[in-house]
């Protein structure tokens, strides 16, 4: 029962909003514009609903900067609450799907729930993945932290700084940094 509005500039789509109307509020679940001007125009559009709804809720990724486009910061309340949860159920399969070519790495994964995920995963220069039991590794990581790396929630540098990963071969840090980069996470889960 929601609405999707697509915004155009010179017959090209430049942004969209997905919103749901409730009794007293309007909830924006997806909000994307390609430039500052587009985002400001979209906010102006949403403000027209203020006449009919007492509350406007905009859901955005945790590290989103959307709130800085709102001119009246005093009238705004920002709550950050991550509402997405992911779980790697098969580490070897997940690594194979990523096509990690160009590096020779040995990543030790620790999973306290799924025993099959424990081990050292060797990635060769061609992107082939093989699981080894007990060999020296370049990096040790818990499966939950690996999940955050793979989805781009944290960069490799941030994981090292936060001590969420153990680096056993410092010569491999630059390779790891190239493989695991921070990205915007656009996965949305609705309750």
Report the location of each language-model feature.
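Intrinsically disordered, low-complexity, positively biased terminal segments
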Residues: 1-191
